[in-house]
């Protein structure tokens, strides 16, 4: 069956009522792709650059060793390139499935239509739909079936041709520079996001990729990695990408919590921190991480812990320096399901922590941060230059991570321990670049495609001690960290 035959079939059956229309639609398209299976390698070798770039982008979004389902897997090459611990490919074409099984015998391939997918009892960490939505008879129905194989942390990754290039694609097919494929759905990003919502998913981030879909060495790499993300030029990318997650449901049980409290020269705040700390979840663990203080903070932490044997309090001393090192030490020894940071200066009140807990348990966020820039703060809580710097870095990081944030440097941050384990395992992607820990967590959460939300808090003037920051030196360091992250996150794929 030729592409024109398949298109005529599809247009006719789409106007009929299912299930008869769907049966005919699938039969026609399977016949077409069974025939195309014998030609696919030839046409891909004519322009390998596009498919190599798609595989590179998919590897950016999907870590090695994950459980991956690809719907519309074709010959299985993209799925194999992701190096999954468990890889399952689904395709409408029996001929494509046969070729995929022959090429990649270590992976599992099944002959099935996306609209009739049934993998009862299976769950996957990532579900890939690469260049598939253009062929689906019922996009919403296919997406709804994916809910059955998704757990709360599953990420759906969808890419498809941008509608901007529809006339060019047809021209290339007419000139026989591209094999004519029966693409019928030229959807926008808004269309796909709406269909995802209807199917029970919400978008975490969306982005365009690939300005130059050719293998032209450094020219293509420069165009696709840098130029494709610049204003105006990003309107002309070839592919749209959406990362989505299941719309969250409230946790069935109360998760336990570990609160890590880095403290350096904060002796006068330790007793208050313990006294004002609310009980959270099924169990609350408090870990003080002392940072070589000069005011007996360590002795105060130990004394307060001994005075409250009814509470689960641990005291640790960091071997390194900086808040980031203290947080990493505390998180490494935490036993709670949920990990929180509470700065020992108490400029964010311990009484605010239940708001963060509720946002996590409800599923509203997977990485929750405080924002000091919503409510009016105490007059002396933040100096003017610090306020300007915070607003600037909020805008900058919103662009870099693709999710809106206002306050990057509020010390109160919350993440699931399981997600933090993945973040720590992938820390080499950015390197050990952040002595404060804020950017390390933000960029790591963005790389994992976690839903980032902010909780407005009232920022109070500290009542003891002095700030442990230097405005100009620290601002310059934050700029350098932002530049590094831009290269490894915003311009990385």
Segments (PLM) and residue ranges:
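Class I SAM-dependent methyltransferase SAM/SAH-binding core
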Residues: 74-116
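Conserved donor nucleotide-binding strand/loop of the catalytic core
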Residues: 110, 298-333
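A conserved acidic beta->alpha catalytic loop
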Residues: 290-299
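Conserved class I S-adenosyl-L-methionine
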Residues: 5-63, 217, 226-227
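Acceptor/aglycone-binding surface of glycosyltransferases and processive sugar-polymer synthases
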Residues: 165-185, 318-333, 350-431, 435, ...
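Short aromatic/hydrophobic "clamp" motif used to bind/position activated sugar donors
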Residues: 339
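A short glycine-rich, Lys/Arg-flanked "PGG" loop and its adjoining helix->strand segment in the class I
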Residues: 140-152
């Amino acid at each position: 069956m030729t592409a024109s035959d398949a298109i005529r079939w599809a247009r006719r059956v789409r106007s009929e009522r299912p299930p008869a229309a769907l049966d005919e639609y699938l039969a026609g398209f399977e016949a077409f792709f069974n025939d195309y299976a014998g030609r696919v390698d030839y046409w891909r070798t004519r322009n390998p650059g596009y498919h190599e770039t798609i595989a590179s982008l998919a590897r950016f979004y999907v870590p090695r060793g994950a459980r991956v389902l690809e719907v519309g897997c074709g010959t299985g090459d993209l799925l194999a390139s992701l190096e999954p611990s468990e890889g399952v490919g689904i395709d409408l074409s029996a001929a494509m499935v046969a070729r995929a099984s022959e090429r990649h015998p270590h992976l599992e391939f099944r002959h099935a239509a996306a609209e009739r997918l049934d993998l009862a009892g299976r769950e996957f960490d990532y579900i890939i739909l690469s260049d598939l939505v253009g062929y689906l008879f019922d996009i919403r129905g296919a997406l709804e079936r994916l809910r059955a194989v998704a757990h709360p942390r599953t990420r759906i990754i969808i890419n498809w041709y941008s509608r901007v290039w529809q006339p060019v694609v047809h021209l290339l097919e007419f000139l026989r520079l591209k094999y004519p494929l029966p693409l019928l759905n030229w959807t926008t990003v808004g269309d796909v996001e709406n269909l995802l919502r209807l199917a029970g998913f919400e978008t975490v981030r969306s982005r365009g990729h690939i300005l130059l879909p050719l293998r032209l060495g450094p020219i293509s790499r420069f165009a696709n990695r840098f130029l494709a993300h610049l204003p105006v030029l990003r309107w002309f990318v070839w592919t749209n990408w959406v990362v989505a997650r299941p719309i969250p449901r409230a946790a069935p049980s109360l998760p336990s919590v570990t609160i890590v409290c880095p403290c350096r020269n904060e002796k006068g705040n330790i007793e208050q921190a313990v006294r004002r700390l609310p009980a959270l979840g099924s169990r609350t663990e408090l870990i003080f991480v002392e940072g070589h203080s000069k005011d007996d903070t360590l002795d105060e932490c130990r004394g307060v812990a001994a005075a409250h044997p009814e509470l689960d309090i641990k005291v640790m001393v960091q071997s390194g320096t900086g808040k980031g090192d203290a947080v990493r030490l505390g998180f490494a020894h935490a036993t709670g399901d949920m990990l929180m940071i509470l700065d020992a200066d108490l400029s964010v009140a311990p009484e605010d922590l239940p708001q963060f807990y509720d946002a996590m348990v409800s599923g509203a966020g997977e990485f929750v941060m405080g924002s000091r820039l919503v409510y009016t703060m105490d007059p002396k809580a933040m100096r003017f230059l610090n306020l300007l710097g915070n607003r600037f870095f909020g805008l900058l990081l919103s662009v870099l991570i693709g999710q809106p944030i206002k306050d990057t440097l509020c010390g109160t941050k919350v993440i699931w321990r399981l997600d933090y384990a993945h973040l720590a395992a992938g820390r080499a992607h950015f390197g050990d670049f952040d002595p404060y820990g804020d950017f390390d967590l933000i960029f790591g959460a963005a790389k994992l495609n976690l839903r980032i939300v902010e909780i407005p808090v009232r920022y109070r003037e500290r009542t003891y001690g002095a700030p442990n920051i230097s405005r100009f030196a620290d601002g310059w360091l934050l700029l350098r960290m932002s530049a590094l992250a831009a290269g490894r996150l915003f311009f990385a794929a």
